């Protein structure tokens, strides 16, 4: 494991590029909670331990957040996409969605921390959004958009 989303995405993409000899794209993403000093961060998928379990991760997060009022529950979802070329060129693209951690599960869609993450500028968690709504605001969609802008500028 690397020490950041960027490092982890690059590790994955480098390995794929090395094995295939082709352009490789990989990502790493997770939830970062301000009051928890960025946790769960790069350990988002295994916050409650191995094997990974979304419900256990959410329960651990709710327990860690139980004493914090709404104004202290600031969080962000981060996605970094890495592109590695066989010639060694590397590029990364970041997407961030700001929000806060709710006090209870809300919504039926999505996975992971989606039922707890209230997206800034909305009154919805990721899990309450339709796929189209989530795709407009998600950290992964934003990283993909940044990657697309780069390639439109330099490869057209």
Predicted regions, residues:
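Anionic-ligand binding patches
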Residues: 1-156
